[in-house]
Amino acid sequence: LARQVMLEEQPEYYVVELSSFQLDDMYDFHVHIALIMNITPDHLDRYHYNFEEYAMAKMRILQNQTYEDAFIYWGEDEFLAKYVLAHQPMEQRLLPFHTYPQVGAAADKSDDGLMRLHFENKTFEYPISELALQGPHNLQNAMAASLAALSVGISEDALRKALHDFVNVPHRLEKIAVIDGVRYIN
C-alpha cells in the first residue's frame, strides 16, 4: 500500500483490507466507506481471549468517519447489530444488508429471488440466479460490494455488468463442468 500511495498517477479509490492488528495502531486514518462483513472470534490470543476487546479493535475503522461517509455492515451479525443500536445516533450513513426481506435495510433478498439495493431513494434489483458467483456467502459479498459501488457513484449499468461478469480468482469455487445434470465446482 505504501508503494501505491507513492505512485505518480493515483487511483480514484483504494480498496484495503485491514486487520484488527493494523487498526489497533491507527488513530488518524479516515475511511470514506467502512465495510464489515461480520465479527467472529479470531485472533483472540492477542486480545486476552476477550471477544469484546477484539471486536472493538475491528470497530476502530469507524473512529474518524463523518456524515459524508458510509458504514456498510451485515445486519444479521449479532455483535454489529448490537453495536450500531448502542451507538445511536451514528454520524455516518448506515447501510446494513440482509439475506432475507428486511424493511429499512440498504440491501436485502426478496422472496422472489432478487437482490435489492435501496439507495438514495431508488431501488436497484438484480436476479440472484444471474450473479456470476453463487452461494449465500457470495450473495453477501455482492450486496456489500454493490452498496460500496453505488456509494462512490458507479452506474447501475456498470454494476449489472460487474455482477454478471465477475471472475473469481483461480481455484476459488471455480465452475468446472456440468455432467449429467451435476455441477462440478473446484
Q: Each predicted region: which residue ranges?
A:
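Conserved substrate/cofactor phosphate-moiety recognition/catalytic segment
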Residues: 1-9
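Internal, well-ordered alpha-helical segments in soluble enzyme and binding-protein domains
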Residues: 1, 57-61, 79-80, 138-144
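Short acidic loop-to-helix transition motifs that present clustered carboxylates
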Residues: 1, 20-22, 168
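Adenine nucleotide phosphate-binding catalytic loops in nucleotide-utilizing enzymes
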Residues: 48-55, 69, 91-186
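Short, well-ordered secondary-structure micro-motifs
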Residues: 4, 26-27, 174
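Generic alpha-helical structural context detector
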Residues: 3, 63, 161-164
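Flexible active-site lid/hinge loop adjacent to a nucleotide/diphosphate
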Residues: 8-96, 107-108, 126-132
